[in-house]
Structures are given as C-alpha cells and as structure tokens.
Amino acid sequence: MGLTWLSVGLFIVAHDAMHGAIVAGRPGINKGLGSLALLLFAGFSWRKLIVKHMAHHRHAGTDDDPDFSRGGPLSWYIDFVRTYFGWREFWVLGGSVILYALILGPRWAYVTFWAVPSILASMQLFVFGTWLPHRPDHDAFPDRHNARSTRFGRPLSLLTCFHFGRHHEHHLTPWKPWWRLSRTSQPSGRLSRP
C-alpha cells in the first residue's frame, strides 16, 4: 500500500510540473522533474501527457476531454488507460524489465515494487482524480470546469490522492502545488463522501 501511495506521488509531482508548480518560473526544471517522475511512474512520455492534460483542462468533462468517458467506471478506466498507455510505454516498461532481469537476474522484485504499485496507483488516480470529480451526476457542476471536490478531511485527502480530490479547487487554481490544495477553501462543487 505504501509503494502504491508513493507511485501516486510520482504522478502528482509530474502533474504539478505540467502546471509549473514545482519551481515557479522555471519551465526547464519543471519539465525535467516531471519527465523523470513520469518515466519512473510508468514510462510515460512528458510530451504526450502534457498535451493531453492541457486538453483536459480546456475541455474538462466534455467529449473533447481526453480523460472523460460517458461509460461506467470500469469502461471509463479502460478508456483512460488506453489514452495514456500505448506502444511506447509498453516498450519502455518491457525494456526496463528485460534490462533489470539481465543485470540482476530474474526476480519478482520489479513486479512487486514497481509494476503492481504503478497499476494500483493508476486505479487510485483514476478514482480520486478523474472519476469522482468529473463523473456526470444528478447535481450540476458549479461552472465550466465540470469538476467537483471530495469533502475528505486533510489526512484522508492526503492518503487518497495527495489532496487531488480537491479537484474543483485544482481546476480553479492549477498553478497551486498539491500541498497547497488542502488549504484551499472549497467554494462550491463539493462531492459527498463516496
């Protein structure tokens, strides 16, 4: 569980870097740190993710949003994974596993300590950072961001997704890093506890 949470953290670092929130005014440092975090998380491409993530912010919760689906949670998650995990990621991860096995011999450590936590982290990020905040519901969204926030207290908010459940606040202030989202008031767009 701890490794899954740390894997979520790697993605959150990359996400904040996409918004220039790691080192304000230093896009090169943000890109470098974000690229490294994405590579360690699951072999993802910075270029591919930043383009899709900015499209998500421009078109949140609409058919033009690469993170959005009108299906149920399982089909939405499958679409979500297909959007971000392609042949490049497959070859980066596969090559890493082969290289690791050649250097250290066949072991299950890379599965236990990297692959499984990354897969579980993708599910956690999807549930708390995409599905809960952006799913169509009987309550209307508060504004064009088509995002809601969870009402978890700070400890649970940190554990679920590094305060990324404060998703409406994130869409209102994307330049704020994750550690400042917990201190952002929740003006509207609240979600009940799931």
Regions inferred by a protein language model and the residue ranges of each:
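Hydrophobic alpha-helical membrane-associated segments
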Residues: 5-10, 37, 41, 120
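Long, highly hydrophobic alpha-helical transmembrane signal-anchor segments
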Residues: 1-31, 93-94
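Hydrophobic transmembrane alpha-helical segments that form the core helix bundle
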Residues: 1-5, 60-158, 162
